[in-house]
Amino acid sequence: MRQRILVVDDDASLAEMLTIVLRGEGFDTAVIGDGTQALTAVRELRPDLVLLDLMLPGMNGIDVCRVLRADSGVPIVMLTAKTDTVDVVLGLESGADDYIMKPFKPKELVARVRARLRRNDDEPAEMLSIADVDIDVPAHKVTRNGEHISLTPLEFDLLVALARKPRQVFTRDVLLEQVWGYRHPADTRLVNVHVQRLRAKVEKDPENPTVVLTVRGVGYKAGPP
């Protein structure tokens, strides 16, 4: 079954280029040029991933992202101009999984999309734990004392990466490669913002974390079991 990408961008020429590239890679695509309409499109089309421009008529991309993330774990990749560095952080804090700067190479875009869609439906049984948090890997389920903790797919992948190697301290660059699929140096703000988002969900007290620990000057590691 072909995976569906929803392109949300009011630049008609860019949206057409994205459609051509993505369809050439085997994806189905739909295009929306308005932020408010994008919310309806996500509910009706149930896309596997959303490519979301920051600057949109109707509702800007940051607000769209925030509303989507309130009730959906659909992967969101922001499209942004190089001058929008402040908005990039706001977008990540609002729930975006990744971002790509315009102008970009089609191969780079496709690689980012595939990285976010990469799932393994045949994962062997694997149960992990960090502190008092339990992780059922093949079921993509996280619980504390039997109560479900809702995570986005990327937040789940980040937690699993840490849990699988509890003695390892992960640099941000290593996490960018293992979780986001980057093969070159990239913006480590991606990691910092997602760790904050993950802590807000899995920690009893995010200001005093026991699940995802910071190793000052190095990176992050899993808390003790």
UniProtKB/Swiss-Prot annotation:
Name positions with the PTM 4-aspartylphosphate.
Answer: D53
Name all Response regulatory domain ranges: 4-117
UniProt PTM comment = Phosphorylated by MtrB.
Which controlled-vocabulary keywords does the entry list? DNA-binding, Phosphoprotein, Transcription, Transcription regulation, Two-component regulatory system
Q: Name one GO cellular component term.
A: protein-DNA complex
What molecular functions are annotated in GO for this chain?
A: phosphorelay response regulator activity; transcription cis-regulatory region binding
- Is Cell division found in the keyword set? no
Q: Enumerate the Pfam families for this protein.
A: Response_reg (PF00072), Trans_reg_C (PF00486)
Repressor in keyword set: no
User: Which chain positions lie within coiled-coil regions?
Assistant: none
**InterPro entries in the record:** CheY-like_superfamily, MtrA_REC, MtrAB_MtrA, OmpR/PhoB-type_DNA-bd, Sig_transdc_resp-reg_receiver, WalR-like, WH-like_DNA-bd_sf
Biological process according to GO: positive regulation of DNA-templated transcription
DNA-binding positions: 125-224
Matching NCBIfam families:
MtrAB_MtrA (NF040689)
Task: Give the function comment from the record.
Answer: Member of the two-component regulatory system MtrA/MtrB.
The name under which this protein is listed is DNA-binding response regulator MtrA
Corresponding gene? mtrA
